[in-house]
Amino acid sequence: MTTHVVAETMTTHVGVEMTMTHVAAETMTTHVAVETMTTHVAVETERIKKFQRMTKKKEDVLVDVVKKNGGTNMYELFMPDKNHLTKYLFFTGKGGVGKTSIACATAVKLADEGKKVLLISTDPASNLQDVFDKKLDNKGVKIDEVSGLTVLNLDPIEAAEEYKESVISPYRGKLPQSVIANMEEQLSGSCTVEIAAFNEFSNFITDSEISEKYDNIIFDTAPTGHTLRMLQLPSAWSGFISENTHGASCLGQLSGLESKKDIYKKAVETLSDKNLTTLILVTRAEETPIKEAMRASQELAQLDINNQIMIINGVLTEPTDEVSKNLFNKQQNALKDMPEHLRSMKTYIVHLRAYNVVGIDNIRTLFTDDKIYDDVEKSEVDRLPHLREVIDDLYKNGRKVIFTMGKGGVGKTTVAAAIAMGMAEKGVKVNLATTDPAAHLKYVISENKNISMSRIDEKEELKKYQDEVLSKARETMSEDDLEYIKEDLRSPCTQEIAVFRAFAEIVDECDDKVVVIDTAPTGHTLLLLDSSQSYHKEVQRTQGGNIPESVKNLLPRLRSDETEVVIVTLAEATPVYEALRLEDDLKRANIPVKWWIINSSLYKANSTDKLLAAKGNEEVKWIKKVEEHSNGNFAVIEWKADEIKGEKLKELF
C-alpha cells in the first residue's frame, strides 16, 4: 500500500510541476491567465498536501493498530485488481459483517478491469437485488452499467422445498399422514437448506462451459455457520455415500445424492485447489466476528481449504468525537488481541463507510472513497423506548421463562443479564442460564440473593445426549443400524435437541424462580420435539418414545403465557432479516413473539462525528421497520464502548 501511495503522490507532484510549467508559459501571453492558473495551482497544491497529511495520518493510525512478529506491519487496503485473485472466490463470515458489499465491489472492480465476471449468491439473506437495483433470477442477469458482469441469485430455501418434495412425494398415499408429516419436519432444518445450496452451486464450479465463459466466478456465500456446514458436506457426505449400504434406512437428506457423487468429488477438488480457489474470510474489528473468523478458518483448513485471506471490514481511522474515539480504541484493542493463527494470514482492510453499499456508484467507491454529504436530511425517530419498558411488561404479565433470541454477536447474553437484573430489582428470584462457551457471564453479573446462574456446556450436553441415545440403541439394534444412528447424531439439529434438554432440566429445577436464558430453540427444534407424532423419528425409535419428563413439561409451557421469547437484533439489514426468519420459524411452532430489542444503536449514541452520524442516520429506516413490525413493542439500547457488566447493566434500562 505504501508503494501505491508514494506512486500516487509522485504522480500528483508531476501533475503540479507540469501545471506550474504551463502557468509560466501562460504568463508570457496574459496576466489574467497567470492569476487564474496560479490560483488553480495553489488550490491543487493545498489539495495534495491535505491528501498527504490524510494519507500519513491513516498510515500512522494503521501502523499503531497491530504489531506482529515483533515488528510493525500495516494492513493493506483491499484492492481486488492488485491482489492477484484466483478464478473462484468464496466470501464467508458472520451475518452482517459486509460479505455481500465486498463481494459486489470485488465483482464490479474486476469487471471494470475488463474481466468477465459471474457473481452468485447462495445466501438465504441475500440482498443482491437491492444492491444492484435489478430483479435477479437463478439463470443470470447482465448488469447494464457494468460491462462483463453477470449476477444470479440462488435461493437455497426454495431449492430445499423442491428437494424435500422430490424425496417425500414417492411415499405420499403409501405411508400414514403422521409419518409423512414427521418426514417433512426432518427435511425442514438447516441441513436440507445447505445440501440444496451445495447442489445448486456445485454445478457452477464443475461445469467446463461456465468455467471457459468467465475469468472470475464469485460466491457471496451464506454467513459462517451455514457456509461451514455447506463446505463440509462434500467430504462428509461423499464418505457416507460410499459407506452407505442401508438402502431405505438411510437419512432422508441423502436421497438422490448418489447420482451427484462425481460432481461433488470434482467440486471438493476445486475448492481445495489453491491455484483455482481463494476463501476470503470477511470480519470486523470486533471480538465476536474475529472469533467466528478464527473458527471458520480452522475448520475449513481441516477440509484442506488452505488458500485463505482475511478482510477486516469497517475500520475507522479518523475519530473526531468521544463516541468515535471509543469505537476506534475498541477496534484497535480487538485487532491487537487477534489470535496468532489469524495474524499469520494475509490480511487486508476496508475502511468504514458512511453509506449503505446500494447502487453501482456506491459499489464502485467502496474500496477507494467515502462520501459524507453535509446536506443529507437527518432522519428522526418519534420514540426510542427503553429496555425498562420490556422488563416492566415481563414482570407485570408474570413471565416465568424468558429467552433472548438472535444471531451471534448481537448481544443476547448482555441483554439477558440486564433483564435478569431488572427482574431481580423488583424482588423476583431469577436464574440466569447461558450457553456462552467462555464462562464470562460471571464477569458480567454477580450472583446475589435474588440472582443465581447456570451454565450449559453445549459440547458436554451433546456428548451426554449422544452417549445416552447410543447406549439404549445398542440394546436392540444391529451394528448397521447403529452406524446410521451415529450419523444422524452428528446433525446440527441433534445439538439443538441436546441443549434444549438441558434448558428443560434447569426450568424444571427452578420452578419457584423466573428463568432467563440467553439463547432460544428454533421452531424447527420445537417441532421435532413436539410430541410422539412429530418427535424426531429416529430418536423416538432409539429411546422407545421415552422423552424426558422435563421436556414433556416444558413443551406446553412454551406456548403458554408463562413464556416470552425476546428477539435481539441490530439496526442493520442482515441482522433484521435474520431475526425475521427466526421469528417466522418460531411461528411455525406456534410460539408468539411480542418484544424486539435493537442493541448497540449508533443513532441513539448521538455521535457528532460525521461518519458515525451518517451511519446512525442509516439505522433509522431499520428502527422504523422494527417498530412497525412489532406494533411498537420494541426497545433501543445505545452503542456502548465498554463491556457492560455489574452495576453498568442498569445503564441499559
Where are these regions (language model features)?
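C-terminal lobe/tail of nucleotide-utilizing enzymes
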Residues: 54-60, 64-83, 268, 272-399, ...
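Conserved catalytic network of the ASCE P-loop NTPase/AAA+ motor domain
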Residues: 82-83, 110-113, 143-145, 207-212, ...
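Short, structured motif recognition centered on aromatic/hydrophobic residues
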Residues: 90-91, 106-110, 119, 124, ...
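Walker A/P-loop NTP-binding active-site region of P-loop NTPases
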Residues: 90-92, 97-151, 221, 231-235, ...
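Phosphate/Mg2+-binding loops and adjacent switch elements
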Residues: 172-286, 292-295, 476-574, 578-581
